[in-house]
Amino acid sequence: MNSQQCVIIGIAGASASGKSLIAKTIFDELRRDLGTDQIGVINEDAYYKDQSHMSMEERVQTNYDHPKALDHQLLCSHLKQLKAGQAADIPCYSYTEHTRISETIHMTPKKVIILEGILLLTDPKLRDLMDASVFMDTPLDICFLRRLTRDVAERDRTMESVISQYKKTVRPMFLQFIEPSKQYADIIVPRGGKNRIATDILKTRIQHLLAK
């Protein structure tokens, strides 16, 4: 497999904007045509920097919505490996421990790689590796309600901590970094991950890129 046979799609937008849903929909529908081993999803969250050397008190103070919290250099390196036909060991991140864990996920080269994450489009080096990019333009109040429900139910968070983080970093960093990165998207998707027309447009674009 050479670099021309690996299509990389980036899906960005606010936390809980529908990125994972549209990524899963594309994955489920394309794998029927390509085969499960020929399409993969990489979550930008896996590349939060290792904080195992820090105390839990220090870890919870990290601004996870700032580009500096992420190791985009490692993500770029892994994408280049995969495009070159080489496997990559994707890190795993624990939302409860606020750091990476020792396990990794061994990813073999794919025909299609779907990236999803809040800050993907803020990094020009990452953008250069993408064949197409998407921004989920979901209203921020809807994103907040989804995030609150998800983090309390799935990430062992308290309602108070989620609200505090939203006020302190999530909303300000969205306005400073994430929303301005919308200008770099090839496709802007309103109404969240259940937008069927947008999903079909993205699928058609991927199929066109694969046919080149």
UniProtKB/Swiss-Prot annotation:
InterPro entries: P-loop_NTPase, PRK/URK, Uridine_kinase, Uridine_kinase-like. It is an enzyme of class 2 (transferase). Pathway: Pyrimidine metabolism; CTP biosynthesis via salvage pathway; CTP from cytidine: step 1/3; Pyrimidine metabolism; UMP biosynthesis via salvage pathway; UMP from uridine: step 1/1. The keyword ATP-binding applies. One of its GO terms (cellular component) is cytoplasm. Gene3D superfamilies: P-loop containing nucleotide triphosphate hydrolases (3.40.50.300). It catalyses: uridine + ATP = UMP + ADP + H(+); cytidine + ATP = CMP + ADP + H(+). Its main location: cytoplasm. One of its GO terms (biological process) is UMP salvage. ATP binds at G13, A14, S15, A16, S17, G18, K19, S20. GO terms for molecular function: ATP binding; cytidine kinase activity; uridine kinase activity. CDD domains: UMPK. Its EC number is 2.7.1.48. It holds the Pfam family PRK. This is Uridine kinase. The lineage of its organism: Bacteria, Pseudomonadati, Pseudomonadota, Gammaproteobacteria, Alteromonadales. The gene is udk.
